[in-house]
Design a protein with these regions (language model features):
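Bacterial N-terminal signal peptides that target proteins for export
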Residues: 1-10
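A residue-level marker of the well-folded mature domains of exported/periplasmic proteins
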Residues: 2, 24-439
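C-terminal motif of bacterial Sec signal peptides marking the signal peptidase cleavage site
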Residues: 18-22
Length: 439
């Protein structure tokens, strides 16, 4: 397999006080959320604290103390026991990946009544409304105001850049940015840095951004989330691949090849499926969109047993993505389709309406996706889709406000992994998961 450059290390953090509940430029097509101010009567309930095995070792969580009187044999026995417990703990938490660590965001306080500009990827999906809700609630708690904007479509990169420029001209205390493109915003980011305005990324990072311009990111570890989806998918597909006489095709639907979050969810899924299939002795290849073919770890090969077929529409529209789904469903060797966000998941449901090929039966095409919303939740519940990865969008919105406030205070900030969970019809009503499934 091709070697993949290591991604940025995300510092784990503790998120407390977050609870799931729920514009500027006249020349750009945009949706706008009104600025919000303090409301001292509102409180935020305490969230669940979860600690990663890696953070336990590096940051001193649950460290075991050893006395000098312990013999070498006792120490070795203790190490073996601790390692086994850590492995078991890691396995038990594999389906619920949430954040924890060294920065307690629940203790953030604003030194002044700051104003923030936040430029989102858009409002065309309920996901962004959930992020907005979290941001509004936390802004009210901290006594700061914000202006939350985004383009009408996640294809409107130029509109988003214009909104970012308008945000800079407003001279806020800090700016939140969910970048649609990993390079289109770089000039504006440099301008913000020169003006002394810190930028906090959310949902997507901005690889290649001018050094020091983006001070932190609040996002899911998207590559790891794609891997999680692949692991759960391969558990179901393993026997079908083994039983197939010829090649099998796994479709990968991405709404674009420009957003870091979408790309990494796709690559995480592709690379992990390839790793698992190759471990079982199968050959794997990737075809379709050039970006994913070139950036995946998979070496192209002829006559592969497992074909990962990546479909990306020319524009981010429901119609084009539904057509991509139908094209994949109509290929005789397709056994699965994975959609890497709410847009793609809903397009899968739409594309399947006339064909009725998605499902968990042996002669059906397995469907897995990302996020939630009414359409996806119902499709998982009724078996059209097997499962999905949910993020924590309300917690993400709150974390953005916390990081913006810390940056405006002049405090040290760090990346926040807002976590992800795998859900199916069997566990989607569990309290820990249901709180992250928005309508």
């Amino acid at each position: 397999m091709k070697q993949r450059k290591p991604g940025c290390y995300i510092v784990a953090v503790l998120l407390a006080g977050l609870m799931l509940g729920g514009c500027g430029n006249p020349n750009a097509k945009a949706n706008t959320a009104e600025s919000v101010s303090a409301n001292d009567s509102e409180t935020v309930s305490e969230s669940e604290e979860i600690v990663s095995a890696e953070a336990e070792t590096e940051n001193g969580f649950e460290k075991e103390t050893e006395t000098e009187s312990e013999s070498e044999t006792e120490k070795e026995t203790k190490k073996a026991t601790d390692a086994k417990e850590t492995e078991t703990e890691s396995e038990s938490e594999s389906e619920t990946e949430t954040v924890k660590g060294t920065i307690d965001l629940s203790k953030v306080e604003a030194k002044e009544a700051y104003h923030f500009e936040i430029v989102s990827k858009g409002f065309q999906h309920q996901y962004w409304q959930a992020v907005l809700k979290g941001a509004q609630e936390e802004a009210e708690r901290l006594g700061v105001t914000m202006n939350f904007v985004g383009p009408n479509s996640e294809s409107d990169i130029a509109d988003q850049v214009q909104m970012l420029n308008s945000a800079i001209n407003a001279k806020p205390a800090a700016i939140g940015l969910a970048a649609l493109s990993t390079d289109a915003c770089n000039d504006a980011l440099q301008q913000a840095k020169d003006a002394g305005i810190p930028i906090v990324g959310f949902d997507s990072g901005v690889p290649g951004a001018p050094e020091g311009s983006v001070v932190a990111n609040a996002a899911t570890d998207n590559y790891a989330a794609g891997e999680l989806a692949a692991e759960k998918t391969y558990e179901v597909l393993k026997d079908r691949i083994a039983a197939a006489e010829g090649s099998v095709r796994i479709g990968v639907m991405g709404q674009d090849a420009t957003s870091e979050s979408i790309i990494n969810r796709g690559l995480g899924f592709i690379d992990k499926i390839a790793e698992l299939a190759e471990a079982d002795g199968y050959t794997v290849t990737v075809e379709g969109n050039d970006k994913y073919v070139q950036d995946s770890k998979v070496e192209p090969t002829d006559d592969a047993k497992v074909i990962l077929d990546v479909a990306v529409p020319s524009q981010v529209t429901a119609e084009l993505s539904a057509t991509d789904c139908q094209t994949l469903l109509n290929k005789e060797d397709t056994i699965c389709i994975y959609g890497s966000n709410q847009h793609s998941g809903e397009a899968m449901v739409t594309g399947n309406e006339n064909l009725q090929k998605l499902g968990s039966g042996e002669d059906q095409v397995l469907g897995v996706t990302f996020d939630s919303g009414t359409v996806i939740k119902e499709a998982v519940k009724n078996g059209t889709l097997y499962g999905a990865v949910t993020q924590a969008p309300v917690a993400m919105g709150a974390a953005v406000i916390d990081l913006l406030t810390m940056a405006a205070n002049g405090e040290e900030v760090a990346d926040v992994d807002t976590g992800c969970q795998w859900y199916t019809a069997d566990n989607m009503d569990d309290a820990e998961i249901a709180q992250n499934l928005y309508d």
